Curated annotation (Swiss-Prot):
GO terms for biological process: establishment of competence for transformation; sporulation resulting in formation of a cellular spore. This is ComX pheromone. Residues 1-45 form a propeptide. Changing residue 49 to A: Induction of srfA is delayed approximately 1 generation. It comes from Bacillus subtilis (strain 168). Keywords: Competence, Lipoprotein, Pheromone, Prenylation, Secreted, Sporulation. Trp-53 is modified by farnesylation, which is essential for activity. Modified by the tryptophan prenyltransferase ComQ before export to the extracellular environment. The type of isoprenyl derivative differs among the different pherotypes and depends on ComX primary sequence. The keyword Hydrolase does not apply. Interacts directly with the sensor histidine kinase ComP and stimulates its activity. The DNA sequences encoding comQ, comX and the N-terminal two-thirds of comP show a striking polymorphism, which determines the specificity of the quorum-sensing system in the different pherotypes of Bacillus. In ComX, the sole conserved residue is the modified tryptophan essential for the activity. GO terms for cellular component: extracellular region.
Amino acid sequence: MQDLINYFLNYPEALKKLKNKEACLIGFDVQETETIIKAYNDYYLADPITRQWGD
């Protein structure tokens, strides 16, 4: 997941296309892609002190 976050940070236009459903991640269907984007948003928008991935 960290690799995906780094990719989104380096290529924000790719994230924009994913959010607009103009693209999807290879190997993931649209629903899985939406789940990944939600996880990214939840992580990225979280307070840096409380940022952590699930156990």
